[in-house]
Swiss-Prot record:
InterPro entries named in the record: ATPase_NBD, DGOK, DGOK_C, DGOK_N
Protein's name in the database: Probable 2-dehydro-3-deoxygalactonokinase DgoK1
Disruption of the gene: reported phenotype: Cells lacking this gene fail to grow on galactose as sole carbon source.
GO biological process terms held by the UniProt record: D-galactonate catabolic process
Domain of life from the UniProt record: Bacteria
One term of GO molecular function: ATP binding
Primary role: Involved in the degradation of galactose via the DeLey-Doudoroff pathway.
Pathway(s): Carbohydrate acid metabolism; D-galactonate degradation; D-glyceraldehyde 3-phosphate and pyruvate from D-galactonate: step 2/3
Similarity comment: family membership: Belongs to the DgoK family.
CDD domains: ASKHA_NBD_KDGal-kinase
Length: 306
């Protein structure tokens, strides 16, 4: 049976692929998910993977496709470039890159670049989440936290990105937990409770004394050796130390901040919400999956109006 639709929306990450068929009323008519991210697609072919998923939901041949994420990277399907900040979110759709020599209309959204020589930064994929999340925020200035392998903190003013900072918190956690002496402290625990005192105490201690971060990291191992800290608590301390360091850096120079928009989902979203609220910050949560779909929808409707 053919799945009718207005367009297909794709979030193509480094190691993940998500596709939604969207109807004219904005409803999700079909969905596909896989681990065929940019790394896989660069070997097997972006067009081949996309066509396979479209065929699996019997998408019509004329259906246009809007894509965000790593498919637009230099190593991706076709480089979509960057929009330089400060930039209005409304510019994103107008700067989409078309894929040539294909039998349907396929566009890839650009990323954002901050070319400040002292604070260079880039994002690709998160700008689409921002576009979707902005509808929930309204006018005024907002600080947006987008947790992930490389977390983004974005300064928004009236739907305009004034600047942003990336923190390698997720990647550092994985590296430290797997490949340093702290691996011995956390190896016996895969998870921990987000609301545990070990986690929130580590967030607070590191935010208060960010210059001591590496000392606090070593104390995770020392605490286990000297006081028998449980592996789950050690893992919570490691995570809390790194997230506390991130929060300290993100809020430095931001002036008085009493609230943060958190664009996240799942366990990671819960973890960051707990961390932020433990620091007395008001959190306005936006689901990350809903935000990326809303951003892709806004771009698609700007490019292909009904």
């Amino acid at each position: 049976m053919t799945t009718a639709g207005y367009y297909a929306a794709v979030d193509w990450g480094t190691s993940s692929f998500r596709l939604w068929i969207i109807g004219e009323d904005g409803a999700v008519l079909a969905e596909r998910r896989s681990a065929e991210g940019m790394t896989t697609a660069a070997k097997t072919g972006f067009h081949t993977i996309l066509d396979g998923h479209l065929a699996a939901v019997s998408a019509p041949a004329h259906l246009p496709i809007i894509i965000c994420g790593m498919a637009g990277a230099r190593q991706g399907w076709k480089e979509a470039g960057y929009i330089e900040t400060p930039a209005a979110l409304a510019e994103i759709a107008g700067r989409a890159t078309a894929i040539p020599d294909v039998d349907r209309d396929i566009r890839i959204l650009p990323g954002l670049a901050q070319r400040d020589r002292r604070h260079p930064d880039v994002m690709r994929g998160e700008e689409t989440q921002l576009l979707g999340a902005a509808a929930h925020l309204g006018a005024g200035s907002h600080l947006v936290c987008m947790p992930g392998t490389h977390s983004k903190w974005v300064r928004l003013a009236d739907d305009r990105v004034e600047g942003f900072s990336t923190f390698m918190t997720g990647e550092l956690f994985d590296t430290i937990a797997r490949h340093t002496i702290l691996s011995h402290a956390v190896a016996e625990a895969d998870t921990f409770a987000a609301g545990s005192a070990a986690f929130t105490d580590a967030v607070s201690r590191t935010r208060e004394n960010p210059a001591l971060a590496t000392n606090l990291l070593f104390s995770v191992r020392a605490g286990q050796l000297l006081h028998g800290t449980a592996a789950a608590d050690a893992r919570a301390q490691l995570s809390g130390t790194l997230i506390g360091l991130e929060i300290a850096g993100a809020l430095a120079g931001s002036g008085s901040v009493d609230g943060v928009c958190l664009v996240g989902s799942g366990g990671l979203g819960t973890l960051y919400r707990t961390a932020l609220e433990s620091q007395g910050l008001n959190v306005r949560a936006v689901d990350a999956d809903e935000a990326v779909r809303a951003g892709l929808s806004a771009a698609a409707r700007a490019i292909w109006p009904l």
